[in-house]
Curated annotation (Swiss-Prot):
Compositionally skewed regions (Low complexity) per UniProt: 189-202, 399-425
One Gene Ontology CC term in the entry: chromatin
Protein name (database record): SRRM2 protein homolog rsr-2
Source organism (scientific name): Caenorhabditis elegans
Phylogenetic lineage: Eukaryota, Metazoa, Ecdysozoa, Nematoda, Chromadorea
Function per UniProt: Plays a role in pre-mRNA splicing as component of the spliceosome. Involved in modulating global transcription, probably acting via interaction with RNA polymerase II. Influences the chromatin distribution and phosphorylation state of RNA polymerase II subunit ama-1. Involved in regulating the germline sex determination pathway.
């Protein structure tokens, strides 16, 4: 189904559902729609050349006259005249305006508004009349009438006729050129035989004249170059003489004045790197050094981590605790810690392990009355040092005692539960 045509489903129809055109139906020939045909053009021309209604135009002109009469009446009222005098004068003014309009002295068409269709048509007609008068066309002329009389065959024939005289003119010019060339060739052939001997002599003379001219030109150029060099040398000599005179006239005190001026000049700052500044920078770097790998220290400050970098403002706004860390004592302690060798670390690790083992080796006996008394009186336990054999025996006994204590704890719990039940009864 396509655009509402055909079956919704091909099921049960015995077909594939393909919609095929009815080839037995005869299609009527479609008429071509002629846009901007002759009828349309005539209608458009009629609308453009439509003349305004003169009755409506006269009515609008009279309205403009009444507007002028009302304005005149308002002026008389402002002056304070009577109603009878005002009516009489306004009536006379109206009659004069109507007479001028009929005679053509008064033109009110310019005052009419262009919003009205008749006023616009009137203005368009006036413009067309001006154009017709400028081109010298009569009032009976219809635009396009001259082309309607011409046929296509006439147009083609006129064009061909205009091209024929041009072709004839071209052929005539070509013939005249050919004749002129032939006459030239004949003259050259006749004169060549007579002037062959004279031409050889003239050619040799021409070569001599050319060589003489070149030699003269070279000599003139060399003379000009020598003159310029002499002028430059004279100028140099004059300048040297003037400089010698100035040196002789100058007093000997000028050297002293120059020395005094040099002394008065302010000493310029030496912008080169001083040794003191470099020492200060090295001291700062030593202070900033932190426990890091040497690879991290060798890197440039841009490649280091963010924690490694710290701007100057943050350094200035640090708390006093940070200043304590910067103290030389703390710095030495850090260096000792991180510069210690592996043997010291191992020794400290073994010592810590031994201390832990000794703490575990303290005798763990079951609580008794004496221990309760010690706990109440806050007396510290006594540490007993034993040999390796005694330590193994004590471990075995502690394991046995722990198993026995667990059994005794279970029995004591059962007895305590039975006692509590009897008490409750």
């Amino acid at each position: 189904m396509y655009n509402g045509i055909g079956l919704q489903t091909a099921r049960g129809s015995g077909t594939n559902g393909y919609v095929q055109s009815n080839l037995s139906h005869l299609m009527q020939a479609r008429r071509k729609i002629e846009y901007n045909g002759e009828d349309d053009l005539r209608k458009m021309e009629a609308e453009l050349n439509r003349k305004p209604n003169e009755e409506i135009m006269d009515h609008n002109r009279k309205r403009q006259i009444e507007v002028k009469c009302t304005e005149f009446e308002m002026l008389l009222e402002d002056k304070g005249l009577d109603d009878e005098d005002i009516e009489r004068k306004v009536g006379e003014y109206r009659k004069n305006l109507l007479k001028q309009l009929e005679s053509g002295e008064l033109n009110v068409d310019e005052e009419l508004s262009t919003k009205e269709s008749h006023a616009r048509r009137r203005a368009a007609a006036n413009n067309r009349d001006k154009m017709r008068n400028a081109l010298g066309l009569g009032e009976d002329y219809v635009p396009g009438s001259s082309m309607a009389k011409m046929n296509k065959s006439d147009v083609v024939g006129a064009a061909m006729e205009s091209e024929l005289p041009q072709k004839d003119d071209k052929e005539k010019l070509l013939e005249t050129l050919r004749l002129h060339r032939k006459s030239k060739k004949k003259q050259e052939s006749s004169s060549s035989s007579s002037s062959s001997s004279s031409s050889s002599e003239s050619s040799s003379e021409d070569e001599k004249h050319r060589k003489d001219r070149k030699k003269k030109e070279k000599k003139q150029k060399l003379k000009e170059m020598e003159k310029r060099r002499e002028k430059l040398r004279q100028k140099e000599r004059e300048l040297l003489a003037v400089s010698d005179k100035v040196k002789k006239e100058e007093p000997a005190e000028s050297s002293d004045e120059e020395d005094s001026r040099k002394d008065q000049r302010k000493p310029r700052e030496d912008r080169r790197r001083s040794v003191e500044r470099q020492d200060q920078r090295e001291d700062r770097r030593d202070r900033r050094r932190s426990p890091e790998d040497p690879r991290e220290r060798r890197r440039s400050p841009e490649d280091r981590t963010v924690r490694r970098r710290s701007p100057e403002r943050r350094r200035q706004q640090r708390s006093p605790s940070v200043e304590r860390r910067k103290s030389p004592q703390r710095r030495d302690e850090r260096r000792r810690r991180h510069d210690s060798s592996e043997n010291e670390r191992r020794s400290t690790a073994t010592a810590s392990k031994k201390s832990r083992m000794d703490e575990l080796e303290v005798k763990q006996e079951p609580p008794s009355d004496s221990e309760d008394y010690i706990a109440k009186t806050n007396l510290a336990p006594i540490r007993v040092e034993k040999s390796a054999e005694k330590v193994e025996k004590s471990r075995k006994s502690s394991s046995e005692s722990s198993s026995g204590s667990s059994d005794s704890d279970s029995s004591s719990d059962s007895s305590s539960s039975s006692d509590s039940s009897s008490d409750s009864e």
